[in-house]
Regions:
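Membrane-embedded alpha-helical bundles of multi-pass transporters/translocases
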Residues: 1-377
Length: 377
């Protein structure tokens, strides 16, 4: 992507090219007939993840190029994250709407999700390709061919801190997502239907919280806002653990507070990485925007994958999801993993990011130096 040049720009062609790949993967998975082979499903996952990587990476890197301004980048990624959560909510609401509103089956609801994706993707990408500009690139590029090229990125202190923070802040919500229904069923004794409603409240709050984190970043700086986000995640986890969930109003309020920080880390880390990319370009003369965002995407996925190890640990403790007589040790382990481990990871990420030195005044100096060199970015 960093090597792409042409009349359509650097990122637009990749976003457009992701559409047929995502459509193909969606049709393979959402329209799969009963009895399809594991190989077919595996291939469908490969296709859809390929398309998703193309689309999300081009989108994130493109957003970083829309403005060189420190604060404006926070706003851009704030609306980007708002759109992400809104889109996720819209898709997740399709199955219950089909089942409850149209008397459809669960299978029809799942397929409706696929058709929604197939129908909306070309429209959304066409609007973005038509209406969103892409500034010209002045810095030269040198393709990364060796492992050392990637390791050199992590030698930059700002980039290394961002990658570590992304790993930690991807790991923590991955754990809570994986164990959410188990925790509310086994520890809080909340029925699955009510737990799903609480999850909806959580994501609505996450969507509404995204602009708030952008606003806070403009007021106190991105790295301080990110540290505050991590500490709020920690506090919300302790609140979820401490407050009984038997009263719907109380449970809803607690889950709304817990959802508010959900959108903060993705948008703030990406806005900060755009600033770190400017610093790297000043140092090397090379624009590695797409490479930086691909590495950040990778650290987030590693964090999500690490979250799945909690299933192995729960199994070792003898926890059974469908059982109603899990041992005390298994339930303590579940609570420790749902609350304790993400809380520790959030605290550690706050410590990591408080050492970050690329603030607004420093970024202004970097942009001025790039301008003097004739590299507007």
């Amino acid at each position: 992507m960093d090597r792409t040049r042409g009349r359509l720009g650097r990122f637009r062609p990749w976003l457009i090219a992701s559409v047929p790949v995502l459509i193909a993967g969606s049709l393979m998975l959402f329209m799969a007939r009963p009895g399809v082979s594991a190989a077919w499903l595996w291939l469908g996952l490969v296709v859809i993840y390929l398309g998703f990587s193309m689309g999300s990476l081009s989108q994130q890197a493109w957003a970083s190029a829309l403005s060189p301004d420190y604060d404006q980048r926070s706003r851009i990624y704030g609306w980007w994250q708002t759109g992400n959560v809104l889109g996720m909510l819209m898709v997740l609401l399709i199955p219950p709407l089909v089942e409850l509103g149209l008397n459809g089956s669960r299978v029809q609801g799942i397929r409706a999700m696929g058709w929604y994706i197939v129908a909306m993707l070309p429209v959304a990408v066409a609007i973005a390709a038509w209406r969103v500009g892409e500034p010209a690139q002045d810095a030269y590029d040198r393709p990364a061919r060796r492992l050392s090229d990637y390791l050199d990125l992590l030698a930059d202190p700002s980039i290394a801190r961002l990658m570590l923070a992304d790993l930690l802040m991807g790991w923590a919500p991955g754990i809570t997502a994986a164990l959410f229904l188990f925790y509310f069923d086994q520890i809080k004794k909340v029925p699955e239907a009510e737990a799903n409603i609480l999850l909806l409240v959580y994501f609505v709050a996450a969507m509404l919280g995204a602009p708030a984190w952008s606003w806070l970043a403009v007021r106190i700086g991105k790295h301080r806002a990110l540290a505050a986000n991590a500490l709020m995640i920690l506090a919300s986890l302790l609140l979820v653990m401490a407050v009984p969930m038997h009263q719907p109003a109380v449970a809803g309020a607690v889950m709304a507070l817990a959802g508010l920080p959900y959108s903060g880390a993705p948008l703030l880390l990406r806005a900060m990485l755009a600033d770190a990319g400017d610093q790297l370009r000043l140092k090397t003369g090379v624009d590695r925007t797409a490479l930086l965002y691909s590495v950040l995407t990778g650290t987030g996925k590693i964090g999500s994958a690490l979250a799945l190890t909690t299933f192995i640990m729960l199994d070792a403790l003898g926890f059974h999801a469908r059982a109603h007589d899990n041992s005390r040790a298994a339930l303590i382990g579940l609570q420790a993993m749902f609350v304790g481990l993400p809380a520790d990871l959030s605290l550690l990420s706050a410590v990591v990011i408080l050492g970050y030195r690329l603030d607004a005044p420093r970024h202004l100096e970097i942009r001025a130096a790039l301008a003097r060199r004739g590299d507007g970015g």
